[in-house]
Amino acid sequence: MEDLLTNPLIIAAIIGIISAIFGKKSKEEKQNSQKRKKPQHVQSASPQKKQSKEDAPAPIPNRMEQARREAEERRRETARNLKGLERDLAAAKQKTVYTKQKMLQVNKDTVVQGIVLGEVFGPPRAKKPHRTMRPARKN
């Protein structure tokens, strides 16, 4: 029993189980309170709907004009966003082209330096093993 209480994994598991149990209860209470609040909002909104139905016939042309304005505004915003995206895409393409050109730039000095370093370091040990290892492999 003492070993169980000193093991941190078991203690963490017990704490997790307890918190899960209490967490479920609090979630259920929140859901119940939200369900109770919703019907109250529906009742208070119904008189407003009745009033708006009486006023509704007059502003129909205004609604259409407003909808048209909103659609036009969304179209303009979409066009602005599209132009911005096109600029970003063009900049990204130019950047990739620039990096490719930069990677492919090879001048005489870098080629000579690469050849010299290749000769200095020589072939890898796997291709040219040490002398002491050759007899051991043959056996």
Curated annotation (Swiss-Prot):
Disulfide bonds: none annotated. It is a single-pass membrane protein. Disruption phenotype: No visible phenotype, no effects on FloA or FloT membrane rafts. Residues 25-87 are annotated as: Disordered. One of its GO terms (cellular component) is plasma membrane. It is found in: Cell membrane. Residues 65-87 have a biased composition (Basic and acidic residues). This is Membrane protein YqfB. The lineage of its organism: Bacteria, Bacillati, Bacillota, Bacilli, Bacillales.
